[in-house]
C-alpha cells in the first residue's frame, strides 16, 4: 500500500524573510543563543520545513553585555587551532569577551544550527555587533524582546 500524502512545501511568497533586532544586554548566553537559532531556522513559523531555509535574519546588538551564570566567566574555555604544530590557543570567556565579544554569541548559535550546508547558509543570516549600533537600518528590523532570565 503506497501513501499519496504529499509533503506541503511553502510558497516562494511565504518565504520572504523578516529582520529582527535583539538586544543581548544582560541576557543569558545559552538561552539567548537557543532562541536566536530557533528564529534563524524558522521554527517559530507555521511554514517550517526542515530541509529549507524558512528562517529570518537576526541582528544582535550589545554582544559585549551578554552574561553567563556561575563561574563560567572565568572557567568557560574557547579553543582555536591555527593548524600548525603547537598552534592551540585557549581563552576564557572573560578574555574573549574583552577581545572579540561578537565571537561568543556566534560560537554559541553556530553550535545550535545543523552541521551541514543548510546550517552554514542559516549562519550567514546572523549579524552580531558589540555595541548598540548596527548598519542595517535600511532593512527596517523589528525589535524582538527575549527574556532569558527565569522568574524575571
From Swiss-Prot:
Bias (Polar residues) ranges: 139-152
InterPro entries with a match to the protein in the record: Ribosomal_uL13, Ribosomal_uL13_bac-type, Ribosomal_uL13_CS, Ribosomal_uL13_sf
Any one Gene Ontology molecular-function term assigned to this protein's record: mRNA binding
This protein's UniProt keywords: Ribonucleoprotein, Ribosomal protein
Region of interest (Disordered), residue spans: 133-152
Gene3D superfamilies: Ribosomal protein L13
One GO location term (cellular component): cytosolic large ribosomal subunit
Gene Ontology BP, a term: negative regulation of translation
Role: This protein is one of the early assembly proteins of the 50S ribosomal subunit, although it is not seen to bind rRNA by itself. It is important during the early stages of 50S assembly.
Family membership noted in the UniProt record: Belongs to the universal ribosomal protein uL13 family.
Subunit structure comment from the entry: Part of the 50S ribosomal subunit.
Protein name: Large ribosomal subunit protein uL13
Source organism: Thermosynechococcus vestitus (strain NIES-2133 / IAM M-273 / BP-1)
Lineage: Bacteria, Bacillati, Cyanobacteriota, Cyanophyceae, Acaryochloridales
Amino acid at each position: 500500500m503506497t501513501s499519496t500524502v504529499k509533503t506541503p512545501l511553502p510558497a516562494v511568497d511565504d518565504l520572504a524573510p523578516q529582520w529582527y533586532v535583539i538586544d543581548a544586554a544582560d541576557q543569558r548566553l545559552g538561552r539567548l543563543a537557543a532562541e536566536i537559532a530557533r528564529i534563524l531556522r524558522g521554527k517559530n513559523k507555521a511554514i517550517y520545513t526542515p530541509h529549507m531555509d524558512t528562517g529570518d535574519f537576526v541582528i544582535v546588538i550589545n554582544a559585549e553585555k551578554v552574561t553567563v551564570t556561575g563561574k563560567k566567566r572565568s572557567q568557560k574555555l574557547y579553543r582555536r587551532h591555527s593548524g600548525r604544530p603547537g598552534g592551540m590557543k585557549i581563552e576564557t570567556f572573560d578574555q574573549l569577551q574583552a577581545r572579540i565579544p561578537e565571537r561568543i554569541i556566534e560560537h554559541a548559535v553556530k553550535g545550535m544550527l545543523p552541521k551541514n550546508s543548510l546550517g552554514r547558509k542559516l549562519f550567514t543570516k546572523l549579524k552580531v555587533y558589540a555595541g548598540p549600533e548596527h548598519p542595517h537600518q535600511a532593512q527596517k528590523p523589528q525589535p524582538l524582546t527575549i527574556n532569558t532570565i527565569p522568574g524575571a
